[in-house]
């Protein structure tokens, strides 16, 4: 049976007695903060694929646009939580490195001692729906409370779910709650947004129209609140970041 070493400074109490100007007082021992970033990362639910994502290992390959995007995301993380907006929204096509940069920002923020949670949009909604109780008209409270209450939430692939009224109502309630309470939200999306400068297209397959804008997939209210609280960064780069990164191995 292993035993955990007791701090020699505080004897395991977490507090030490200090004297300043002949006045005694207590302050937190450094043992409470040592390793805090590591503990926060263990609880963050970041997928193994992105667990080591950082600004240092993001491959820009000399592309100025990617350098500018990384610089903007890094600035958000470095100035957190005193930046102009509590949230960050990364818009770009699949494979543009959005998730890597979002996780890099979250990890940098956690290094400062803030708690963060990663969740995939579709998985989150599926978890909430799976726990839905029609008799009480309530959903999976654990998953729902997590995204409402977490200090910093990273929501990956925002809008990547079949559109229904329930989906739009759920994402609206989450975004609105976090916006009203100034709880930081980092989000990524493949969906274009005309007002963010994206080209928007409508695709049709087998006679069915598929909606391809952020507004149509999450609704007007959620989109409005999202843009209100977030610094919006659009990534226009055609080469797949995953393929480009793979060439390095």
Predicted region positions:
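Short glycine-rich substrate-engagement loop in P-loop NTPases that contacts/grips substrate
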Residues: 65-70, 110-149, 162-165
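P-loop NTPase Walker A phosphate-binding motif
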Residues: 100-114
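Pre-Walker A (pre-P-loop) alpha-helix and adjacent loop at the N terminus of AAA/AAA+ ATPase modules
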Residues: 59-88
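Loop/turn-to-beta-strand initiation segments
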Residues: 114-115, 149-152, 181-187
């Amino acid at each position: 049976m292993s035993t955990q070493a007791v701090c020699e400074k505080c004897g395991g109490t977490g507090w030490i007695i200090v004297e300043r100007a002949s006045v005694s007082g207590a302050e937190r021992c450094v043992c409470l903060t040592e390793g805090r970033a590591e503990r926060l990362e263990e609880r963050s639910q970041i997928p193994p694929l992105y667990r080591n994502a950082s600004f240092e290992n993001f491959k820009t390959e000399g592309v100025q646009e990617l350098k500018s995007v990384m610089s903007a995301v890094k600035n958000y993380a470095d100035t957190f939580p005193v930046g102009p907006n509590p949230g960050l929204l990364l818009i770009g096509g699949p494979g543009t490195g959005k998730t890597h940069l979002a996780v890099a920002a979250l990890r940098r923020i956690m290094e400062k001692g803030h708690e963060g949670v990663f969740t995939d949009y579709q998985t989150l909604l599926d978890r909430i729906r799976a726990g839905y109780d029609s008799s009480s008209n309530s959903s999976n409270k654990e998953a729902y409370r997590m995204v409402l209450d977490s200090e910093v939430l990273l929501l990956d692939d925002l809008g990547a779910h079949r559109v229904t009224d329930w989906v739009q109502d759920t994402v609206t309630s989450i975004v609105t709650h976090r916006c009203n309470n100034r709880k930081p939200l980092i989000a990524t999306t493949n969906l274009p947004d005309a007002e963010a400068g994206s080209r928007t297209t409508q695709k049709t397959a087998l006679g069915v129209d598929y909606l391809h804008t952020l507004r149509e997939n999450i609704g007007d209210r959620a989109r409005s609140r999202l843009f209100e609280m977030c610094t919006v960064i659009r990534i226009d780069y055609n080469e797949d970041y995953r393929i480009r990164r793979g060439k390095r191995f």
